[in-house]
């Protein structure tokens, strides 16, 4: 027996011990009661604990661990007295089935206590409740110690708050865009989600689900997951949610049907829709069965413990009775019925009995054709036909009485389901003599039409799918008619083809209207349709003849080519009538160019037309440059040469007019016939069943890769049409032209195109009435379990958001500026932080990227939505930092940029320049120079514009040097927390500021549109771009300063040793090395001060050790040069002054001393927090100790006259040793800002650093060289 000891301390959990005094750990608590919950008192508690503890090397909360314990307790040795030996197999304990029943076990999920459970005795109920409470408290207290798992939440939770005017998005966890789209499309059918909400019985709310057949258990779990997902989509306050459990269940179902894994792989959306719908339909049947048969259970043991896997006789069936079979007449919702295998129409409706090797998927074939026929689809279905039930060979006892209201409720659900999706297709064969024979009747659920995009438009493709003009060599044809059609119709657009067994995607343009009438496909209109279709076929035959005539007139054979017959007659008429000769003479007269032609031309024999080679051959000769170009001399036909010329010309004119008239008549007849064909069904009688386009799934990519997103119709309260783009996490408002351009396709491989369409019957108000409820009214209509789940999720998010806001407010108070922020009285628009989630790794080349990746780059134009503004505190902080950095940049390079925006645009132009720049990328994509791109070449303009935004970064991401030379590349890969919309802004602005003709114009239009749509006219985005460009410029400047310093140190340590140089040259080079080091220190220090704002420390081009090295070596070298001048009897300190050769500024001795003092203070400051981590680093503490010792010795033993400038230098050195207070350093413009490309700067810096090997040894050598100089000073 278990004892409980309360500590008595408020808020602490109880400890649970056995009589032997051994306390149970939290994990042991959890496992103990998991096991005890199942086996109750059939095994002694001590035996349970012993079995748990002897497996302590295993993970104690793993499901396999618990399963092993239970199996061991029931299989090891003889069972205890009074306990039967039983085998436990079920979803909870069978490893193969455990994962299908629930997700991975979580220590925080304790199974709730059920007081009605038959295994809980009345004596132990109170104790059990208290024990469960103790476990829950213990686990809750230890939950905080669990390792946190990655989350889909953004680092800035403000970005997760959903705008109530937009739909909830779905998180893309990796190639799940297809499931996101299907979920959004199914969710957009209000009545369907209502059916899912209410069809599930209460018994399904607990795991594992037992009130269902074993073979349908996973289907039931799928339905429950869709219920939860739809409820979250409808009521969540988060911008997007995840579908993790749902994709796992779909994967299990796919693999159980011998299909491929769906996790992490792209799937064919249309194929997966049919499969998911089949699974949901099975679950719906099972749900209604459970509603009407609440006693049904797949558990066959008398104590509800043992789940039998027998396929013969169920144990104890005489006690609990065999579960009743499904009532096929009342509950079946068939997905398909038998179809004559000879029919070639509508392969989607044919249930092939044998696996087919023909691929049916855009993304590949499944290993086996999945049967969708159910044995309960017909009245003849009996329980003996249903596999997996161990008791179906026994007569079914009478089912318990069910309330009439429950029966009516289930009937209503079934009726609504059928009205939404179910239809019956009647396939008829019409012989040549008009005899009609019915081939088959097929029930389709859902009604899914597979259309070939090669027909170009929806109605032609639909007619081809439903009407066949002949089978084999017979003259009969087959037609499909429907009665009825459901409220929702799906169209799949077949966009795959095979060429040499290689699957490829068809990018053909395919148009479809927003409204269609389906009356022409209904069985009730059969008689009228037969007449209209017959008339239409006659018109089509006539149209075929007319087009054949037009083809003969316009494509008349000539040699190896074709010519227009009218043009040929026109040419002959002009030649015979000397038309060209007259034109030539007229032009010469009109230009006052008179010359006489020889009469011989009139008698020139006509020997045939002059071919191009005849008169071009001489011009091709090398001497043609000396021969004047005489133009063309056309042959002349005279009456003498051509008797009857006048009559022939008249005949030609008549024939030419006849040809023109015939062509005009053919064109008019073609237009008339086409209009008749198009208007055949446009009669009021065939416009009763109106369907409206409701959703589109669009695909971009190729057959084996790409990305899906959804367009969904939303109607405002006043009935206005609005379209919403649901691209994984993102929901944006778009207009119909945008939907049309993305859906119809253009034939280009780069253009997206529609892949699936969903139409909804316009008069089906009952279908969408749920969307007309207020949020509160809708919430009250969903079942209590979903209400609880929604409220729980909402409370969790609100709590996280509140904590985030409190932390964020605290952080802003720490870094807020002193100047007050003016608060606007207007409504504050939505704001955003431009930081991206740290857990999101940007992968520009991925085509299944999150909206923060390339998908957002390609599709979310900045002018397509209102870009939120940055919070006032962020904007003020950014402006302050930009101003501070701009001041430092202008001190170093005062004339390089006119203002901050010029700095930004200059960096953006550099992105487009160079061998690996954007201009070369665009030229390579176009195949010709960008400046030759015409403004009317819409496809090229659109393609290359999007390609640059989408692919350029992915192309150069592996060129690591470019990450520090191209500004936008640096932002994209070094500052990985920057949101992708900022990257798009930078790429678009880069095209705008470059001279790229129509491309620049297009980029400027997008930026202008963004400014118009933004509440702050794009100020926030510009401010972010300015800040990033200044960060980049400071990074390049720090690399430049460090490189120039090391370059001068290289000259000091190497070149000056090889040649006799003047002292002034050494001083100038050393001074320049010090200035370079100072600028590097200032730029790098300023970046470090501001790194907190980016929450990133990847913005530095150079490391601290590089800056320390160039500062130390330049400083100690300059000290040595000063000492040499002080110890010299001939040299004076004024001799150290020099003119900077680059800017002709004279550097005075005082400037040099001041620079040395400042650098020594910096080194002293570094040495205070110095800890040597690498062997080759300079030991700053030892350096400062040696330097102070040398200088103090020199100062103490040396004296000069007060009037001597060397005395002032000595006092400066003395002050440097005594006073180590670091003064504020200022950047210097004494050096020419001859900055190289960022990558080149770093390459040169690393080269010099490696060559110089600036280590303690070289430092000691320079410091040791002070000794003879100090001895000379002492002697003086």
Curated annotation (Swiss-Prot):
EC number per UniProt: 3.4.19.12
Taxonomy, superkingdom: Eukaryota
Pfam families given in the database record: UCH (PF00443)
Active-site residues, Swiss-Prot/TrEMBL: 177 (nucleophile), 707 (proton acceptor)
UniProt biased composition (Polar residues): 380-393
Stretches assigned to the USP domain: 168-762
Catalytic activity from the UniProt record: Thiol-dependent hydrolysis of ester, thioester, amide, peptide and isopeptide bonds formed by the C-terminal Gly of ubiquitin (a 76-residue protein attached to proteins as an intracellular targeting signal)
GO terms under biological process: protein deubiquitination; proteolysis; regulation of protein stability
Keyword terms of this UniProt record: Hydrolase, Protease, Thiol protease, Ubl conjugation pathway
Chain spans, region Disordered: 375-402
One Gene Ontology cellular component: cytosol
Enzyme class: hydrolase
Record keyword Transmembrane present: no
Molecular function terms from GO: cysteine-type deubiquitinase activity
Family of this protein: Belongs to the peptidase C19 family.
PANTHER family: UBIQUITIN CARBOXYL-TERMINAL HYDROLASE, UBIQUITIN CARBOXYL-TERMINAL HYDROLASE K02C4.3-RELATED
Protein name (database record): Probable ubiquitin carboxyl-terminal hydrolase K02C4.3
Organism field: Caenorhabditis elegans
Lineage, opening ranks: Eukaryota, Metazoa, Ecdysozoa, Nematoda, Chromadorea
């Amino acid at each position: 027996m278990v004892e409980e000891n309360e500590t008595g301390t408020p808020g602490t959990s109880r400890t649970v011990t056995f009589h032997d005094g051994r306390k149970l750990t939290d994990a042991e608590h959890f496992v103990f009661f998991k096991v005890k919950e199942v086996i109750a008192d059939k095994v002694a508690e001590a035996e349970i604990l012993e079995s748990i503890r002897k497996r302590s090397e295993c993970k104690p909360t793993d499901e396999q661990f618990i399963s092993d314990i239970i199996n061991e307790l029931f299989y090891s040795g003889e069972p205890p007295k009074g306990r039967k030996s039983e085998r436990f197999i079920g979803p909870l304990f069978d490893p193969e089935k455990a994962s299908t029943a629930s997700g991975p076990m979580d220590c925080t999920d304790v199974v709730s206590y059920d007081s009605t459970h038959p295994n809980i005795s009345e004596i132990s109920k109170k104790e059990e409740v208290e024990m469960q409470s103790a476990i829950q408290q213990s686990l809750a207290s230890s939950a905080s110690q669990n390792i946190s798992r990655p989350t889909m939440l953004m680092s800035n939770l403000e970005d997760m708050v959903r705008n109530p005017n937009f739909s909830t998005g779905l998180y893309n966890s990796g190639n799940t865009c297809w499931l996101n789209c299907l979920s959004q499309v199914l969710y957009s059918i209000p009545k369907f989600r209502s059916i899912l909400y209410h069809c599930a019985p209460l018994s399904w709310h607990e795991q594992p689900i037992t009130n269902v057949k074993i073979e349908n258990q996973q289907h039931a779990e799928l339905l429950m997951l869709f219920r939860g997902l739809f409820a979250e989509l409808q009521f969540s306050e988060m911008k997007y949610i995840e579908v993790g459990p749902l994709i796992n269940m779909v994967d299990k179902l796919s693999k159980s049907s011998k299909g491929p894994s769906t996790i992490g792989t792209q799937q064919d959306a249309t194929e997966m829709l049919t499969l998911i719908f089949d699974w949901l339909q099975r679950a719906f049947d099972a749900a209604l069965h459970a509603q009407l048969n609440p006693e049904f259970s797949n558990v066959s043991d008398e104590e509800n413990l043992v789940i039998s896997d027998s396929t013969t006789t169920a144990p104890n069936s005489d006690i609990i009775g065999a579960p009743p079979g499904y009532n096929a007449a009342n509950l079946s919702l068939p997905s398909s019925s038998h179809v004559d295998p000879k029919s070639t129409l509508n392969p989607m409706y044919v249930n092939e009995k044998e696996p087919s090797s023909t691929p049916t998927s855009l993304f590949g074939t499944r290993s086996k054709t999945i049967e969708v026929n159910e044995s309960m689809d017909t009245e003849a279905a009996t329980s003996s036909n249903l596999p997996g039930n161990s008791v179906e060979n026994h007569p079914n006892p009478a089912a318990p009485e069910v309330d009439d209201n429950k029966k009516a409720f289930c009937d209503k659900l079934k009726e609504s389901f059928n009205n939404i999706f179910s239809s019956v297709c009647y396939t008829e064969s019409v012989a040549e003599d008009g005899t009609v024979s019915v081939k088959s009747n097929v029930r389709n659920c859902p009604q899914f039409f597979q259309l070939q995009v090669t027909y170009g438009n929806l109605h032609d493709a639909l007619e081809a799918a439903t009407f066949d003009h002949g089978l084999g060599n017979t003259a009969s044809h087959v037609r499909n008619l429907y009665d009825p059609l459901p409220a929702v119709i799906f169209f799949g657009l077949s966009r795959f083809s095979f060429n040499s067994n290689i699957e490829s995607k068809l990018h053909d343009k395919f148009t479809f209207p927003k409204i269609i009438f389906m009356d022409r496909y209904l069985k009730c209109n059969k008689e009228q349709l037969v007449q209209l279709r017959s008339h239409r076929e006659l018109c089509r035959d006539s149209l075929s003849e007319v087009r054949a005539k037009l083809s003969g007139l316009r494509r008349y054979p000539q040699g190896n080519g074709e010519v227009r017959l009218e043009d040929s007659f026109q040419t002959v008429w002009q030649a015979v009538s000397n038309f060209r000769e007259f034109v030539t003479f007229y032009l010469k007269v009109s230009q006052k160019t008179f010359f006489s032609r020889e009469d011989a031309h009139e008698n020139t024999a006509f020997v045939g037309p002059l071919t191009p080679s005849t008169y071009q051959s001489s011009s091709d000769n090398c001497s043609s440059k000396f021969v004047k170009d005489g133009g063309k001399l056309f042959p002349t036909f005279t009456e003498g040469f051509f008797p009857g010329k006048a009559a022939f010309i008249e005949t030609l004119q008549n024939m030419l007019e006849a040809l023109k008239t015939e062509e005009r008549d053919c064109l008019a007849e073609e237009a008339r016939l086409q209009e008749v064909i198009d208007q055949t069904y446009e009669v009021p009688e065939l416009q009763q069943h109106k369907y409206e386009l409701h959703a589109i799934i669009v695909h971009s990519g190729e057959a084996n890769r790409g990305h899906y997103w959804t367009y969904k119709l939303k109607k405002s309260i006043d009935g206005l049409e609005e379209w919403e783009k649901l691209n994984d996490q993102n929901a944006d408002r778009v207009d119909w032209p945008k939907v049309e351009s993305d859906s119809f396709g253009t034939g280009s491989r780069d253009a997206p195109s529609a892949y699936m369409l969903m139409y909804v019957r316009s008069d089906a108000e009952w279908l969408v009435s749920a969307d007309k409820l207020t949020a509160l009214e809708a919430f009250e209509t969903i079942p209590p379990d979903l209400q609880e789940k929604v409220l729980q999720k909402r409370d969790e998010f609100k709590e996280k958001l509140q904590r985030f806001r409190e932390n964020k407010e605290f952080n802003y108070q720490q870094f807020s500026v002193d100047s007050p922020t003016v608060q606007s009285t207007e409504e504050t628009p939505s704001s955003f932080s431009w930081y991206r989630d740290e857990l999101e790794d940007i992968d520009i080349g991925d085509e299944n990227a999150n909206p923060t990746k390339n998908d957002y780059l390609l599709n979310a134009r900045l002018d397509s939505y209102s870009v939120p503004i940055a919070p006032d505190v962020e904007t003020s902080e950014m402006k302050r930092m930009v101003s501070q950095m701009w001041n430092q940049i202008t001190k170093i390079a005062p004339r390089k940029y006119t203002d901050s925006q010029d700095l930004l645009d200059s960096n953006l132009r550099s992105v487009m320049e160079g061998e690996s720049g954007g201009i070369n990328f665009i030229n390579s994509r176009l195949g010709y120079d960008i400046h030759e791109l015409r403004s009317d070449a819409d496809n090229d303009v659109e393609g290359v514009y999007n390609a640059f935004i989408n692919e350029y970064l992915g192309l150069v991401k592996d060129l690591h040097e470019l990450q520090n030379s191209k500004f936008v590349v640096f932002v994209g890969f070094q500052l990985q927390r920057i949101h992708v919309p900022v990257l798009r802004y930078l790429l678009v602005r880069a095209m705008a500021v470059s001279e790229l003709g129509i491309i620049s114009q297009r980029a400027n239009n997008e930026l202008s549109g963004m400014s118009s749509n933004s509440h702050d006219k794009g100020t926030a985005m510009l401010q972010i771009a300015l800040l990033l460009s200044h960060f980049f410029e400071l990074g390049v400047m720090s690399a430049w300063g460090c490189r120039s310093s090391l370059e001068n140190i290289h000259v000091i340590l190497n070149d000056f040793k090889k040649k006799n140089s003047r002292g002034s040259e050494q001083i100038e080079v050393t001074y320049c090395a010090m200035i370079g080091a100072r600028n590097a220190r200032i730029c790098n220090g300023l970046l470090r001060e501001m790194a907190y704002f980016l929450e990133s420390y990847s913005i530095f081009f150079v490391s601290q050790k590089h800056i320390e090295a160039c500062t130390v070596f330049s400083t100690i070298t300059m000290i040595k040069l000063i000492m040499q001048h002080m110890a010299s009897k001939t040299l004076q300190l004024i001799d150290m002054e020099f003119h900077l050769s680059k800017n002709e500024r004279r550097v005075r001795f005082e400037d040099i001393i001041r620079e040395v003092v400042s650098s020594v203070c910096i080194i002293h400051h570094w040495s205070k927090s110095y800890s040597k981590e690498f062997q080759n680093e300079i030991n700053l503490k030892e350096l400062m100790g040696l330097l102070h010792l040398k200088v103090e010795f020199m100062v103490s033993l040396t004296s000069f006259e007060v009037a001597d400038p060397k005395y002032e230098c000595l006092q400066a050195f003395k002050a440097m040793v005594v006073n180590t207070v670091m003064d504020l350093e200022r950047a210097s413009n004494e050096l020419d800002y001859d900055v190289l490309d960022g990558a080149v700067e770093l390459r040169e810096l690393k080269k010099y650093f490696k060559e110089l090997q600036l280590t303690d040894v070289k430092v000691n050598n320079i410091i040791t060289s002070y000794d003879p100089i100090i001895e000379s000073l002492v002697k003086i």
